[in-house]
Swiss-Prot record:
Residues binding Ca(2+) 3, per UniProt: D94, D96, D98, E105
Protein name: Calmodulin
InterPro entries: CALM/Myosin/TropC-like, EF-hand-dom_pair, EF_Hand_1_Ca_BS, EF_hand_dom
Pfam families tied to this protein: EF-hand_7
Swiss-Prot/TrEMBL keywords: Acetylation, Calcium, Metal-binding, Methylation, Repeat
Chain sites annotated for binding Ca(2+) 1: D21, D23, D25, C27, E32
Length: 149
């Protein structure tokens, strides 16, 4: 499954993996998964976190290592119910629910994920996605960016 990913995708997933792997030991625990999900405004139960880990924990050791994470991401990318997932992701970024992701909202979520970005980097991310040039990202623009990944 993961062999269908490009080098660029693998590099991006490695970066995402390290956001989850807070202590840098090469494994994501339920505790680390919970921390990241809560920073994104989700509130999973311990049982839900365990289910998520069990779903991809090929060797059964109770944690997710990078190859297992890659398989999960490859599966998620093939998922056809991505429309609902995209809407959910957009809602996570769109803090005030006004239908737009502002630079401030983008910075807030990225900071919660542990990504310290400069104002220039945040503005650049907005510019890359902002097709109509209004300085913020609407849902259609968000979908375009996410589908291009």
């Amino acid at each position: 499954m993961a062999d269908q990913l490009t080098d660029e995708q693998i590099a991006e997933f490695k970066e995402a993996f390290s956001l989850f792997d807070k202590d840098g030991d090469g494994c994501i625990t339920t505790k680390e998964l919970g921390t990241v999900m809560r920073s994104l405004g989700q509130n999973p139960t311990e049982a839900e976190l365990q289910d998520m880990i069990n779903e991809v924990d090929a060797d059964g050791n109770g944690t997710i290592d990078f190859p297992e994470f890659l398989n999960l991401m490859a599966r998620k990318m093939k998922d056809t119910d991505s429309e609902e997932e995209l809407k959910e992701a957009f809602r996570v970024f769109d803090k005030d629910q006004d239908g737009f992701i502002s630079a401030a909202e983008l910075r807030h979520v990225m900071t919660n994920l542990g990504e310290k970005l400069t104002d220039e980097e945040v503005d650049e991310m907005i510019r890359e996605a902002d097709v109509d040039g209004d300085g913020q990202i609407n849902y259609e623009e968000f979908v375009k960016v996410m589908m291009a990944k």
